From Swiss-Prot:
Similarity-based family: Belongs to the ketopantoate reductase family.
Catalytic residue list: 192
Any one GO molecular function term: 2-dehydropantoate 2-reductase activity
Protein name: 2-dehydropantoate 2-reductase
Organism: Nostoc sp. (strain PCC 7120 / SAG 25.82 / UTEX 2576)
Enzyme Commission code(s) on record: 1.1.1.169
Any Pfam family: ApbA
PANTHER family named among the record's database cross-references: 2-DEHYDROPANTOATE 2-REDUCTASE, PROBABLE 2-DEHYDROPANTOATE 2-REDUCTASE
Residues the record lists as binding substrate: 105, 196, 200, 262
Length: 319
């Protein structure tokens, strides 16, 4: 058992899977839950995985951060639509000189946390994971699982490979989770957006799985156009994404099992969509420096309309 104590904020498809793997490998893990608390506190966690199913009959489950111990590493695995809760959730459980590991999609999340806790170390994690929460405490891991880690510094300046990244990498790799270490977190975030913007966005707008988007000539072309706009957005912030990476993402998705994206699942279940973190923030960062991304701009406005109507039955009206 390693000496680092982990807290998992958001025990869903992502946090539940990685937290369960860490505990199974001997880490001291503490899970914050909301609606699933009673079930998980009583019965633990079940992970059904392509790599082998397993059950954790007992876990450290909490429904209140005030009851949780101070932890060395706090894993933020909430949807970004819940980030307004972080000023209340994070300060009670992060040790002085502790680490906040942000396993969230999109751009700008590390900056938000640095404003809340300027004294802690922040590491961004980019997860390449196909996983769904089937029920309370029941996670179905379909494919992949790799995490790419990069440490945050003010303005997303390049931090290189730090000792803190190496320590977390060791714990996760001991748990059977593949880790890649990044010298440049901002480049990594933009690379992740190459996949996230087209597939998450179009899956909602067009009511389609990833395999359907890739099987049709017209939608595949649209996916590729959106990817090249993400490349242009990255360039506007001084980061270069090679064309070969875009081709790799297209090939990777063709080989993937048919997948309903996380944004599509949220839409189908009438939950708030991560439109701002995944689409809005990158779009606005590019616009701030005079770079227009017309396809992404169109996608953003479509998603804002669908998200508002889906959850409230009302249209978004300027105040």
């Amino acid at each position: 058992m390693n000496e680092r104590k982990y807290a998992i904020l958001g025990t869903g498809a992502l946090g539940g899977y990685y937290g369960a793997k860490l505990q199974k490998a001997g880490s001291d893990v503490h899970f914050l839950l909301k609606s699933d608390y009673e079930k998980v506190n009583q019965d633990g966690l079940l992970v059904e995985s392509k790599d082998g199913d397993f059950t954790l009959p007992q876990v450290n489950a909490y429904n209140d951060v005030a009851k949780m111990p101070k932890c060395d590493v706090v894993v933020v695995a909430l949807k970004t639509t819940q980030n307004h809760l972080l000023p209340k959730l994070l300060p009670p459980i992060v040790k002085n000189d502790g680490i906040v590991l942000v396993l969230q999609n999109g751009l700008g999340v590390e900056e938000e946390i640095a404003e809340i806790l300027p004294q802690v170390h922040i590491i961004g994690g980019l997860c390449f994971l196909c996983s769904n929460k089937v029920g309370a405490g029941y996670i179905h891991h379909l494919d992949y699982g790799q995490i790419t880690l990069g440490e945050y510094a003010h303005g997303y300046s390049n931090m290189g490979i730090t000792d803190r990244m190496q320590q977390i990498s060791h714990d996760f790799q001991t748990a059977g989770i593949s880790i890649e270490l990044l010298e440049d977190l901002l480049l990594g975030r933009w690379k992740k957006l190459v996949w996230n913007i087209p597939y998450n966005g179009l899956s909602v707008v067009l009511n389609a799985r990833t395999d359907e988007l890739m099987a049709d000539t017209y939608t595949r072309t649209l996916v590729e156009q959106l990817m090249y706009e993400v490349k242009a957005g990255a360039k506007s912030m001084g980061r270069n994404i090679p064309d070969s990476f875009i081709q790799t993402m297209l090939d990777y998705t063709v080989k993937m099992k048919p997948y309903r994206t996380s944004m599509k699942i949220d839409y189908d279940e009438c939950r708030p969509l991560e439109v701002e973190a995944i689409v809005g923030n990158p779009l606005h960062k590019a616009q701030e420096v005079g770079v227009n991304l017309p396809q992404i701009n169109c996608l953003y406005h479509q998603l804002k309309f669908l998200d508002g109507r889906n959850r409230t039955g009302q249209l978004t009206v300027d105040s």
